UniProtKB/Swiss-Prot annotation:
Name recorded for this polypeptide: Endosome/lysosome-associated apoptosis and autophagy regulator family member 2
Organism of origin: Bos taurus (Bovine)
Cross-referenced SUPFAM superfamilies: Mannose 6-phosphate receptor domain
Main localization, broad class: membrane
Gene: ELAPOR2
Pfam family, one: GBD_ELAPOR1
Amino acid sequence: MLFLRPGPARGRGRGRPARAPHSGLSPPWSPAWICCWALAGCQAAWAGAGDLPSTSGRPLPPCLEKDYHFEYTECDSSGSRWRVAIPNSAVDCSGLPDPVRGKECTFSCASGEYLEMKNQVCSKCGEGTYSLGSGIKFDEWDELPAGFSNVATFMDTVVGPSDSRPEGCNNSSWVPRGNYIESNRDDCTVSLIYAVHLKKSGYVFFEYQYVDNNIFFEFFIQNDQCQEMDTTADKWVKLTDNGEWGSHSVMLKSGTNILYWRTTGILMGSKAVKPVLVKNITIEGVAYTSECFPCKPGTFSDKPGSFICQVCPRNTYSEKGAKECIRCDEDSQFSEEGSSECMERPPCTSKDYFQIHTPCDEEGKTQIMYKWIEPKICREDLTDAIRLPPSGEKKDCPPCNPGFYNNGSSSCHPCPPGTFSDGTKECRSCPAGTEPALGFEYKWWNVLPGNMKTSCFNVGNSKCDGMNGWEVAGDHIQSGAGGSDNDYLILNLHIPGFKPPTSMTGAMGSELGRITFVFETLCSADCVLYFMVDINRKSTNVVESWGGTKEKQAYTHVIFKNATFTFTWAFQRTNQGQDATTLRKKPTSAWSVHLIPTCPYIRSMARRLVFHVGLGVEALSNLSSVGSLMNGPSFTSKGTKYFHFFNISLCGHEGKKLAVCTNNITDFTVKEMVAGSDDYTNLVGAFVCQSTIIPSESKGFRAALSSQSIILADTFLGVTVETTLQNINIKEDMFPVSPSQIPDVHFFYKSSTTTTSCVNGRSTAVKMRCNPAKPGAGAISVPSKCPAGTCDGCTFYFLWESVEACPLCTEHDFHEIEGACKRGFQETLYVWNEPKWCIKGISLPEKKLSTCETVDFWLKVGAGVGAFTAVLLVALTCYFWKKNQKLEYKYSKLVMTTNSKECELPAADSCAIMEGEDNEEEVVYSNKQSLLGKLKSLATKEKEDHFESVQLKSSRSPNI
């Protein structure tokens, strides 16, 4: 049996793939030549055996044109090929045409033509069909076209094998949605792959919508060796504005090209991401197309040689391969553009009309007018259908908005420069010494302001093009009806720039203004309201979104940059790709929009506060640069590893907030950042900011990715040693207790940007702690109880430890040490107390040198004094001893004299000195001993036994 490769690539419509293109003629010894000659031999044998009986005894019938088809062989090295006839399956016949030389391999027909294989000439496509010539197109996505494949992977190589993860990626894929195909919404990496073989250089073109930077979207091309082509250097696809389609085109080389549309979602919270949408994929450069393709339902082609099918207008429809569109019965049926059938008109309800207010007339009156939503699809003549309310009721016009006045006409005009008005009175000049606070404040919605516009957009169709997405309603503006449930109802506010007050001129990094709006959403099904900002017409970024029914509330967004802003509100009833036209949900409403610059006195107060704080934290001057902290890692539900990265700038520098966080989601934005573009919108600057970092190994990218940058602190509240300031409290057990007695210094900040979770904005507290063990910038940490830096998502806490946070040194922080006296001189040194809990301040005094006396001199003096004292004591002892001897002698003599006169008559006692007595001796008797007496007694006590008692002879007569 003889097998040949499939035929050449065919252009297609409605998303059907073309066959792979073929090469041409091979050398005579090649397999292609062998196959051709073998086929010719078989055909000759079949022709010669035409009269022979078949296996059933009957000859084979001759082959008709319907019994076979033509195909080309593979191309040889010279670019030639053969056209051969291939019998259709289950057909037995004889007499196939002989092989003939085919067209060159690079041959192709023009758009609107196809290659008629019998004569090998290009022919125009008939009515109801179309052809791209050498291209293929995929514009119908009711199902995944043949040739396309989905490959879902989880590229995190750190967490572990896929079977250990909580959820796999088996259910993640690109989903066909009719007119477009939609990417995955989870954090899996899903590739939409299509392989094509080109005979000549060509290109690939597709339209896409990519509005959410929480999804990475890349398009690249590989060859048959799985090597990326040079043309995929810039594989990251640019973001588009919300509700708008962008286009992407890449040149293709001849040969095999494998096309990849790859998306990776980054889910760090509960908020769902918006998927990437792709439609109208066109590939140019295939060899030829051998047939024209019928127009898809809802389109038609009324001319031969068409390369595109036209869309059927409203209230018409068409089937596949239509030459024209068929009109619906407009009395009872309707259809949208590009419909394949007509639908019955439903009865009219209150959701099928809206009211508007006419401009004020000269009498100050406005009329309430009721109109059907266009195009009108309902019927008034059915049972239970309502009628359109009567129009023309007059009411008093609301006053002008603040800053505008009524000059007697039917419209409001802005106040001249230097004047102001609350909207109800004439414009007045500002008092002396004051300036007008410029801004817009829309409180009354009688007519749409001149700098606002409204529109309707649908990603899959044009049903609501030309409709008003929002309608004014007196004291508020509300979303319109739209044409489908998944329409985007868009309201734009354009601001060419900001003019800060004179008192703020020259301030850098300051709050230039803010926009505040009050809104509520009333939804009976799934709905979402987006608030988006575009700076200098670069790209629209979603700032905040609210899903489902929300009560009346206010939201504020702060502006720090003087640039051209476009603020956008987009309301969508459902974020799924559906084409429901009969359901019309309740609207969302906005009551007021305030767009005002910051008041001058607030900015002046802030400058004074920073001035006083600067005097108190002089010791922190070396911490004026940005401190950084990366904590984690954390993991998503499917195991994606990520980190929280914080930048902290305590006081900024010359009014600039140095803490900057960026989103380098694509190579394109990285190039913008490197180029220093002032319009780089993926960059935020503040006192404290946060980014989500995804390491390179986590998703298979060549570099770490930074996304979801948010401002945590843009307003400095104050600095104090207290733990509470303006309702921001730092609990005592949040951080470890400081080992020193030095109090911690606390910096308090606030962010004016509010979110659905933080209605009062975010706040930040930074605890500065003196730690001599951490020099330089030190280290930043978060509470152990709140590893993400916050426990509620609204208040963030940081502990910054550094020696630079220590107080200034004083004379109480050092002590002196005296050295030894050497050669009459002595040194005094000064050293810091340990541990040293201070920095800078006063310096250590220089060492002091003073005169002194040595120890030898005083030793000699002491010895001399001691010797003198000893001699003196010996002399005194001898003196008192001699004195004591004399006293004892006199006492003994007195006693002897007294005893010798006992026998004599008593004589008169006399104290007088007798003649011949010596007056030099005097004896005094005292009952109380003196100190010397006591010493003498002690000295003579042992000598009492040395004296003998002698009986003296009495001089008295015994007879007396």
